[in-house]
Amino acid sequence: RRNIITIFKGNDRYILEDTDVVLNKANQGVQTLERYKKVFDNKLSILNEYEFNDIVTLENVIVAIQRAEMVMRIVEDIQSQIYELGNDGRLVKMQLEELIGGVEKEELLIIKDYLAVTKKKKTPETVMEELSEIPYEELTKQVTVAKLLGYENFDNYDEVGVYTRGYRILSKIPRMPSNIVENLVLSYKSFQHILAADIESLDEVDGIGEVRARTIKQSLRRMQEQFVFDNIVV
């Protein structure tokens, strides 16, 4: 007879599987995560370039959020297996941390950039929580994500133009405090206005001196060049 370990908590019970079985599942999960992360990175790379060129559609935003959420759900499954593995899960944990760096933050900032202004006045964190709770089948529907972002139902989301506020891109500028990012967005309302602003104009924003204004302009120019390069098909 096999030795079986069962954990009880209240009316719930959980049967611990053999370590080799759990480790195999975790490794398979990491392989799946690598594929999903690659797709997310691709969608994010497209969004990066489109935001600079001001050609983002609602579909671009929805797909990026869907892919980020899919990645995070796989992460949750692997994390539960890591907990069960204990010390045997250290290598898997290291692989996981290396793979997912920044995905959750990117998703939150995408939502913050595109969350529609409605009477409900939802926060990006609230939308993130709502996304994590919907069934997978609903997550794959563009209308579901659009509704959570505060947009109405459209026949073709690829034909609905939207603009970014700029939180996500601006957060990539080195030594850029979140309060300065907030001041920029509040002052200019959209990323395109920030992109078009000259050094003198940026200098007038609270917390930004001439040195930081130059850093912002230079960093944005370098990022734009890099994002275009990233999407060149060889």
Description of each model-found segment:
Residues N3-V56:
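Conserved phosphate-handling catalytic cores of large alpha/beta enzymes
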Residues R2-N3, Y188:
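Short, well-ordered alpha-helix to beta-strand connector turns
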Residues R35-E51, T57-E204, E210-V234:
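Long, highly charged, low-complexity intrinsically disordered interaction regions
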